[in-house]
Regions:
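Short, hydrophobic alpha-helix immediately C-terminal to the catalytic nucleophile
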Residues: 118-122
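A conserved short beta-strand
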Residues: 126-138
Length: 221
């Protein structure tokens, strides 16, 4: 079921246990977290963090647009503020309202949400695990950024669709190499990291892919 806790939409399993992982799902609304939960094997509380403008709210710094799209505004610092408030309030609310103790805190995101999740883990140390699912790690300047910043997590899940690097857009096409570079960087930092290839393009099976990442974190953190 999905319940409202102080304005936050949170999925709680019907047979919730006394201790559950808390998954913060960047860019997902109620239907998104319900879809992810439906594909998961592990039980977890999942909180929705919907956004109105992915190109603005999930990007860490400005960048030019893709083709004829909107420029990337680089306003992810506002998402950090939301995450700060959430992490200061939600574990206490889950305990007082639902009788649930948070066992671990996980951050997941798809596409630009995956980019934002990894960036947030360089800015905060409150997440035990991070999943960048079909993450937009091609993003201008991210290779250089991640090379010079520590990722504050015990485990990181990375994935891409196998068709994602095969695109005519040169910026998007570097996503495979960029994700491999992030994987190498994280393993050298002794962070438990996995990089999975899924069949299909960037848009295929998004909730199922996110669920795979969430399950892996639940089992490996």
């Amino acid at each position: 079921m999905t319940t409202d806790l102080n304005g936050l939409s949170v999925f709680i399993p019907d047979d919730a246990e006394a201790e559950l992982p808390l998954i913060c799902a960047l860019g997902e609304d109620v239907s998104g977290i319900n879809a992810i939960a439906g594909f998961m094997d592990c039980k977890a509380a999942i909180v929705a963090l919907p956004v109105d403008d992915w190109n603005a709210e999930l990007t860490p710094w400005p960048a030019p647009p893709l083709r004829r799209g909107k420029p990337f505004a680089g306003n992810a610092d506002k998402m950090l503020e939301r995450l700060d408030r959430l992490m200061s309030e939600l574990p206490t609310l889950l305990k007082s309202k639902m009788g649930i103790t948070v066992s671990k805190c996980l951050l997941i995101g798809y596409s630009l949400g995956g980019l934002c999740a990894l960036w947030a883990a360089t800015m905060r140390d409150c997440f035990d695990g991070v999943a960048s699912v079909s993450g937009s790690l091609w993003y201008d300047g991210f290779d250089e950024y991640i090379g010079g910043h520590a990722v504050n997590a015990h485990a990181v899940y990375l994935s891409l669709g196998d068709a994602e690097p095969r695109t005519r857009d040169k910026r998007l096409g570097r996503v495979g190499d960029s994700t491999l570079a992030v994987y190498d960087r994280l393993t050298k930092m002794d962070i438990r990291t996995v990089f999975e290839w899924n069949p299909g393009n960037h848009f295929a099976d998004a909730p199922k892919r996110s669920a795979r990442g969430a399950d892996w974190l639940c089992k490996n953190v």
